[in-house]
C-alpha cells in the first residue's frame, strides 16, 4: 500500500482507539437509559416511609407493580416494613397481591415474618393466596423446601397470623405436599 493510500485511509477512518472510545460511550449511554427505571422511585418512597410521594407517583401513573433487582414490588416492601397505609393505598391502586421476590416469597410471607398482622389480614381479605408456595434453599444443606405463609408463622412464632391463616384454609408446605399439591 502506498504512502498516499495509507494517508487517505487514515483521513477517512478515525484511529481505532477513538472508535472504541465512542463505542464504549454509546454502550454506556444505552445501558444507563435502558436501566433507569423511573418507577423505582415508587419503591424508594415506600422504603423511606414517604406516603405523600407514593400518592404523587401513583397519581402520575407510575407502575404500582414495578420491580427492583430483588423482584420486589412496592407492596412487598410495604408488607416487609409494616407500612399498613402504604399497603392499603397500593392495593387500592391495583397492586398484585401475589407478586414474588426473586426467592419466591410473597407479601403475605413478608407480613407474617415481620409481625405485620394488619397487613396479613388486609392481604387475606383482598384475596391473596393463603397457600402460595415459595421454594427456598437451605444454604447449609443445599436442600430446597416449600414454604407457605403458614410455615412462616411457625418460623416467626406469629400465633395471631397463624390463627388467621388457619381460619382461611392455609396449610403448611408439608400438608400441601401430602395432598399432592
Regions found by a protein language model. Give the residues of each.
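Ankyrin repeat boundary/linker residues
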Residues: 68, 101, 134-136, 143, ...
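Positively charged n-region of N-terminal signal peptides that target proteins for export
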Residues: 2-4, 17-23
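Ankyrin repeat A-helix N-terminal signature
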Residues: 44-49, 77-83, 110-116, 141-145, ...
